[in-house]
C-alpha cells in the first residue's frame, strides 16, 4: 500500500469511528408524547438514516482497500486517480466527482411507493 492509499485508509478509519459515535449518540434518544418531541424524533430518524448511509459507504471503501479493488469505477471499471479519491474517498464511480451529480444525490430524496407524497413531505 503506497503512502497516498495509506492516508486515505487512515482517513476512512477516522470517518468510520466518527460516524459510529454519531450514530450511537443519535440512537440514544428518549421517547416522548409531545408534538415537539415527535418532530424532533422525525429529525433524528432522518439524521440516523443519513449517518447509516455514510457509514455504509465508508465500510465499502475500507473493504475495497483491503480487497485491492479500491480506486476503480463501478460502472466502467476505469481507474480513478488517487488524488481525486483523497478528496472524496467514498466515491464509487467517476461520476461521483461531478458537482451536479453530488448536488442531486444530496438534495433530492428517493421516494418509495410506501412513502408519503413528495409535496406533502415538503410541508410537514
From Swiss-Prot:
Entries under InterPro entries matching the protein: Tscrpt_reg_DksA-rel_prd, Znf_DskA_TraR, Znf_DskA_TraR_CS
Name by which UniProt lists this protein: Uncharacterized protein YlyA
Gene designation per UniProt: ylyA
Zinc finger feature spans (dksA C4-type): 73-94
Keyword terms: Metal-binding, Zinc, Zinc-finger
Pfam families referenced in this protein's UniProt entry, alphabetically: zf-dskA_traR
Top-level lineage group: Bacteria
Gene3D superfamilies to which the protein is assigned, alphabetical: DksA, coiled-coil domain (1.20.120.910)
Molecular function per GO: zinc ion binding
Amino acid at each position: 500500500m503506497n503512502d497516498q492509499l495509506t492516508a486515505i485508509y487512515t482517513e476512512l478509519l477516522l470517518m468510520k469511528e466518527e460516524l459510529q459515535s454519531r450514530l450511537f449518540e443519535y440512537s440514544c434518544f428518549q421517547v416522548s408524547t409531545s408534538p415537539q418531541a415527535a418532530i424532533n424524533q422525525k429529525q433524528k430518524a432522518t439524521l440516523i438514516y443519513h449517518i447509516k448511509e455514510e457509514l455504509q459507504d465508508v465500510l465499502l471503501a475500507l473493504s475495497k482497500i483491503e480487497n485491492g479493488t479500491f480506486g476503480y469505477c463501478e460502472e466502467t471499471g476505469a481507474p480513478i486517480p488517487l488524488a481525486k479519491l483523497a478528496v472524496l474517498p467514498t466515491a464509487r464511480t467517476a461520476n461521483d466527482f461531478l458537482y451536479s451529480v453530488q448536488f442531486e444525490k444530496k438534495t433530492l430524496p428517493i421516494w418509495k411507493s410506501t412513502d408519503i407524497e413528495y409535496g406533502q413531505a415538503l410541508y410537514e
